Regions:
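Basic, Lys/Arg-enriched alpha-helical interface segments
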Residues: 1-65
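Enriched for short, Lys/Arg-rich terminal
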Residues: 70-104
Length: 104
């Protein structure tokens, strides 16, 4: 089985931190569990990342965009060679990314 290196981008880590802080304001213990689970979800992409579906945003991007669902959040990522680049962590209720908003 091929093992992929997993590289979260700065933007994805900032998204994760922002979500953590939002959850923490309401439920600190839940936020800690959520963040630990998110990191486990990141790591899981090292094995068979193509098991994840194409994201709805995929047709609008040059590179293939896939998603891993984690609770109410979507982990958006792309594959390049044997590396998984985690691009964003977005709440499922948020508008879909466009090439313009993907870097916000």
């Amino acid at each position: 089985m091929t093992v992929y290196r997993v590289e979260p981008t700065h933007r994805a880590l900032a998204d994760a931190d922002e979500a953590f802080l939002w959850i923490y304001d309401e439920a600190p213990e839940s936020a800690l569990r959520w963040y630990d689970g998110l990191l486990d979800a990141f790591k899981s992409l090292g094995k068979n990342p193509t098991r994840c579906s194409l994201a709805q945003e995929n047709p609008f991007f040059e590179n293939e965009i896939r998603q891993l669902l984690y609770g109410r959040y979507r982990i958006l990522f792309t594959l390049r060679g044997k590396t998984v680049y985690i691009l964003r962590v977005r709440h499922g209720a948020r508008e879909h990314l466009t090439p313009e908003t993907s870097k916000e």
